[in-house]
Amino acid sequence: MNSKNILIVGAGFSGVVIARQLAEQGHHIRIIDQRDHIGGNSYDARDPQTDVMVHVYGPHIFHTDNETVWNYVTQHAEMMPYVNRVKATVNGQVFSLPINLHTINQFFAKTCSPDEARALIAEKGDSSILEPKTFEEQALRFIGKELYEAFFKGYTIKQWGMEPSQLPASILKRLPVRFNYDDNYFNHRFQGMPKLGYTKMIES
């Protein structure tokens, strides 16, 4: 195979993996990035004062169902098991997220079975919204005003810097509601974080 000079734009996960694969095939690789470091949004570094590992662009938990991907990643870093369990404080009470059966029962002060919880959420939803076009409409249609205002509205404004009425409905489809007691934020089989950080993993 003829060796080629290849320019990779972007030093995040995708860029560095592609670069490594091509380099192992004998190509000459150059990587550029608009930032002055590798790792993309997963870049992390130790705080010099506290020695705490800081995810500079927000927390990242590696999660996948693809065993090939997991095996590839664990060749380059020791992964610490980590399950992301998210809590939210609403009106002085602590709730589990994603919304699950425990969240529903706690919020509405009920002891619903899974089927009863499904029926309750369906009842709370605004059935007059036939084709939701915005995040807000999707939430009101899917989970109703009470859960939307308690768990989604403020968080969404903070995350996106926009009113939910200005965001597309498709965003809410990524936020799960469960009718069991599973409070693991992700459903994937393999979950964890690199022991020495993402930057060290990518450098290897």
Describe each model-derived feature in a short phrase.
Residues 4-31:
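N-terminal Rossmann-like FAD-binding beta1-loop-alpha1 element of flavoenzymes
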Residues 93, 102-204:
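Active-site/ligand-binding neighborhood in enzyme catalytic cores
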Residues 12-17, 41-42, 199:
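Gly/Ser/Thr-rich beta-alpha loop segments that engage phosphate groups in nucleotides
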Residues 49-126:
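Dinucleotide-binding Rossmann-like beta1-alpha1 core, especially the glycine-rich loop
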Residues 23-48:
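Glycine-rich FAD pyrophosphate-binding loop
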